[in-house]
Amino acid sequence: MSNDNKRLPIGKDIATRRRVARKARHFRIRKNLRGTAEIPRLVVHRTSRHMHVQVIDDTIGHTLAAASSIEPEVRAMEGDKKARGAKVGELIAERAKAKGIETVKFDRGGYKYHGRVAALADAAREGGLKF
């Protein structure tokens, strides 16, 4: 009798292992990273198609500013996902500065600081945010 028809237990397929490993990395990062009203947390979430970023005050649990690649001005852009990530970084820097936020703690969400995540962070820095 072959085991081909049996379902694999959770964590045995590659996608699940990667997702669980990213979550574990994010928990390790979050253990020591808390956003305050003075220095909020800049959180990145990445999907296969889009990027979302929020500036969060963890003491009260409120989102102070947000930007996403789903927004019309980013969707209308030509270029690759890295360029769209950079545009999202510019948007979040602009919106955070409008709310009086100059300095943030960067929470990469367990993702590698590479590619779209790095492009977003660099664009936010160029937009005037300090990490």
From Swiss-Prot:
Lineage top rank: taxon: Bacteria
Gene Ontology MF terms: 5S rRNA binding; structural constituent of ribosome
Cysteine disulfide links: none
Residue ranges crossing the lipid bilayer per the database entry: none
GO cellular component: cytosolic large ribosomal subunit
Keywords of this entry: Ribonucleoprotein, Ribosomal protein, RNA-binding, rRNA-binding
CDD domains, alphabetized: Ribosomal_L18_L5e
InterPro entries, alphabetized: Ribosomal_uL18_bac-type, Ribosomal_uL18_bac/euk
A biological process from GO: translation
Gene3D superfamilies, A to Z: 3.30.420.100
Family: Belongs to the universal ribosomal protein uL18 family.
Subunit and interaction comment: Part of the 50S ribosomal subunit; part of the 5S rRNA/L5/L18/L25 subcomplex. Contacts the 5S and 23S rRNAs.
Protein's name in the database: Large ribosomal subunit protein uL18
Biological source species: Corynebacterium kroppenstedtii (strain DSM 44385 / JCM 11950 / CIP 105744 / CCUG 35717)
Gene: rplR
